[in-house]
Regions:
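TPR-repeat structural position
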Residues: 32-33, 70
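Hydrophobic/aromatic packing residues within the alpha-helices of TPR/SEL1-like helical repeat arrays
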Residues: 1-2, 40, 77
Length: 100
């Protein structure tokens, strides 16, 4: 008989957390590259309600804005305010909506 490895749910949480942290590291060290955006997207897919969801979405919005992708940043701002109306990045999201 073969043993079946059972992966505890925490392991998956750690993997998604790592995706967020890698995005943040890339964002802070390289000024918001597409690589950072891909890590944030991966985190948001894997853990849409995770501990870092608000920060990942907010950082994605700010990175897009810094990159001049204002239409995309505005879409993320609307999503951010719907999900996290009093979140850390709400103050940055509101002007992006007004600029639509």
């Amino acid at each position: 008989l073969h043993e079946v490895a059972i992966v505890p749910p925490q392991r998956h949480v750690r993997a998604s957390d790592a995706a967020f942290l890698l995005g943040r590291l890339e964002d802070e060290s390289n000024g918001g590259t597409d690589v950072a955006l891909r890590w944030y997207d991966r985190y948001l897919v894997e853990a849409p309600d995770g501990a870092y969801a608000s920060e990942a979405l907010g950082r994605k919005m700010m990175t897009l804005r810094r990159n001049g992708q204002l239409a995309e940043a505005s879409e993320i701002a609307a999503d951010y305010l719907r999900r996290f109306p009093t979140g850390t990045y709400a103050h940055a999201a509101r002007p992006l909506l007004r600029s639509r």
